[in-house]
Design a protein with these regions (language model features):
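Short, flexible, mixed-charge acidic loops at enzyme active sites
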Residues: 184-196
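Phosphate-centric recognition/catalysis
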Residues: 162
Length: 295
């Protein structure tokens, strides 16, 4: 094939990809609906995870387009550069161009698979946070206020809290860890997690980081409350593992439960219950950090 044809196909591919990208971006902006009034709502359970999923879904068509046409256009460009050569040089160049094309296909495919795997993980996390929030819902009738995906900055480190409850029993932070089971490697106890007060032992191995992270978040949140409201109280940390059986062999500062056990764990009377005024004061603080849902 004449190099002019290669150049034409290459140019067409670039123009086609650019046009598709521009059209997709225009349609995405044009289809945004406008509400009758400007809402500013509290975040729902898994709100930040859902936003990430939506961002991935919005970029997926363009990702697939670039990953399919990118290696093809690049391969054509390489072959166009090799075509004017002659003899052994052309053969070697053709082989290298073919290897370059195959490498592009490989890395593009791996990139797409990673994006799809990330979306699957995020969807599992979102479902876990929804399941925990649903089990906590009855506490609202008992005077609790519930906040989801609370993000707090400016305290030395960033806090991203899945669920925060404020009620007569005090302040409780509930972190959700949703992990899928791997029945091929786990054996007969694939549904169990052991907690000895210091670490989690999953079927595939121990995990100290999760407990330490939840504990540190509770301590940091307690300090932030004291600085922001003047109310000094310990924050109770709870780690929820939806869908897992918890084998408790010890007690620690972090309560570890599944979604069915969480209600009785949170609704434990504190030594010094919070007053209605304190509940309202603390709740207003949390609202400032998770009331940003506009559409």
């Amino acid at each position: 094939m004449n190099p002019v044809w290669y150049s034409g196909i290459l140019g067409y591919g670039v123009i086609f990809i650019s046009a598709c990208a521009g059209l997709f971006h225009w349609r995405t902006r044009a289809q945004r609906s406008r509400p009758p009034v400007e809402f500013k709502l509290l975040r729902g359970p898994g709100e930040l995870t859902l936003r990430t999923i939506r961002t991935l879904d919005a970029s997926l068509p363009l990702t697939l387009l670039f990953c399919v046409l990118g290696p093809l256009v690049g391969g054509l460009g390489l072959f166009a550069a090799v075509w004017p050569l002659a003899g052994v040089t052309q053969i070697v160049g053709g082989v290298l161009a073919g290897l370059g094309f195959l490498a592009g296909v490989f890395f593009s495919g791996r990139f797409v698979l990673r994006r799809l795997g990330l979306r699957q993980e995020l969807e599992l996390r979102f479902l876990g946070e929804r399941a925990v929030a649903e089990e906590l819902a009855p506490l609202l009738a008992q005077g609790f206020r519930m906040f989801h995906d609370v993000t707090i900055l400016g305290i030395g480190e960033r806090l991203d809290l899945d669920h925060v409850l404020v009620g007569p029993a005090g302040v409780v932070v509930v972190e959700t860890e949703t992990r899928e089971r791997n029945g091929k490697e786990a054996g007969p106890r694939q549904h169990e997690v052991t907690y000895d007060g210091k670490q989690l032992v999953w079927p595939w191995g121990p995990d100290r980081n999760t407990i330490a992270q939840v504990e540190a978040q509770a301590v940091c949140l307690s300090k932030w409350l004291a600085q922001s409201s003047g109310i000094k109280l310990p924050v109770r940390p709870v780690l929820a593992l939806p869908g897992w059986w918890i084998d408790l062999t010890g007690r620690g500062s972090v309560w570890v439960v599944n979604q069915k056990q969480i209600l009785s764990t949170v609704d434990v009377q504190a030594e010094t219950p919070l007053s209605a005024e304190q509940i309202d004061q603390i709740s207003r603080l949390f609202e400032q950090h998770c009331r940003d849902v506009t559409n």
